[in-house]
Amino acid sequence: MRVIVTGGGTGGHIYPALAIAKGILVHQPDAEILYIGTREGMEARLVPEAGLEFAGVSGQGLPRKLSLETLKVGGKSFKALWETKQILKKFKPDLVVGTGGYVAGPVVLTAALFGIPTLLHEQNALPGITNKILTRFVRKVMVTFPESIAHFGVRRKLVLTGLPVRPEIGNISRERGAACLGLRSDCLTLLVTGGSRGARSINQAMPTVLKHLAGRKDIQVIWATGKATYQETLESLKTQGIQWQRENWRVLEYLKDMPEAMACADLFVGRAGATTLAEIMVAGKPGILIPYPLAAENHQEFNARALEKDGAACVILDKDLTGENLWALVQGLIEKPEKLRKMAQAARSLGQPDALNKIVKVCLDTAWK
């Protein structure tokens, strides 16, 4: 069995593609996998590091406004179509799976026009433009959120699978997670993160929350500021007279033990990327979600609203975020254990812990049909 996976531009497209590729190899160890991405994108580094074969093509995201750059990008897209055609002829795949991003467009389209079975996976509640255009050409579209179904024109092609998460998520005990971070397992724990790069607006709001929690030894805080703003954040805490080195607080540059932190957390505060939300749903964690305002097509707000609608999260927009607003939300939840419990149940009910197996089944069924 020969499979091409493609997706790029951001980690939100690349990591699901890698998970799907590895999932196929678990079920079909003799499968040959080729990942097609752009030569300049993150995937050119991440895919070989993951031990998969990589083929690079031309590609670049379309500018939002018509300009000379638009023509240059169009030229690269036509070149990518030609390069993809050569790769397909040589590799002769039984299946092509796209996870979005501009590189997936020419690869999936060319494969479909060649009559090769093709699939898409959409990570967000609001589908990306590439996946919406490609829907008419592919066999099936696998979606993460039920809310995204209304945005696709051909509903008979849609399959709700969820988004693959790390296998450790939801499978680590609270006690083990707390011990890993040197914390107690019997205290209410707040997990705050803006992702690996951090989120300046969240980091600027959190000192106010810490001021309110300074006398609460029964509440623990795990706060990953991100590498880019770590020193800046520590300086801000110092300036505001906040002693952050406490036995029940962890203010970190980067959180390498995210599955463990998720296991011992009672409330999550952070952005609303698809992978993050898939993890908090599988782990059954209520969230205070602050969508990244510059995400393409504002898809993070659509993701966050999907959880809010089902009672699994509260949403505050980045433009409205202040320290006191964030504290009001945190306080309103930590002082109402029953509400927190119901939100956790709602989050868990939305989770798809078996997402990868569902996706792999669709892949194998499509390739062998």
Curated annotation (Swiss-Prot):
Reaction(s) this enzyme catalyzes, per UniProt: di-trans,octa-cis-undecaprenyl diphospho-N-acetyl-alpha-D-muramoyl-L-alanyl-D-glutamyl-meso-2,6-diaminopimeloyl-D-alanyl-D-alanine + UDP-N-acetyl-alpha-D-glucosamine = di-trans,octa-cis-undecaprenyl diphospho-[N-acetyl-alpha-D-glucosaminyl-(1->4)]-N-acetyl-alpha-D-muramoyl-L-alanyl-D-glutamyl-meso-2,6-diaminopimeloyl-D-alanyl-D-alanine + UDP + H(+)
Keywords for the protein's UniProt record, in alphabetical order: Cell cycle, Cell division, Cell membrane, Cell shape, Cell wall biogenesis/degradation, Glycosyltransferase, Membrane, Peptidoglycan synthesis, Transferase
Listed GO biological process terms: carbohydrate metabolic process; cell division; cell wall organization; lipid glycosylation; peptidoglycan biosynthetic process; regulation of cell shape
Organism: Desulfitobacterium hafniense (strain DSM 10664 / DCB-2)
EC number: 2.4.1.227
UniProt family annotation: Belongs to the glycosyltransferase 28 family. MurG subfamily.
InterPro entries: GlcNAc_MurG (IPR006009), Glyco_trans_28_C (IPR007235), GlycoTrans_28_N (IPR004276)
Function: Cell wall formation. Catalyzes the transfer of a GlcNAc subunit on undecaprenyl-pyrophosphoryl-MurNAc-pentapeptide (lipid intermediate I) to form undecaprenyl-pyrophosphoryl-MurNAc-(pentapeptide)GlcNAc (lipid intermediate II).
Protein name: UDP-N-acetylglucosamine--N-acetylmuramyl-(pentapeptide) pyrophosphoryl-undecaprenol N-acetylglucosamine transferase
Ligand binding (UDP-N-acetyl-alpha-D-glucosamine): 10-12, 124, 166, 196, 300
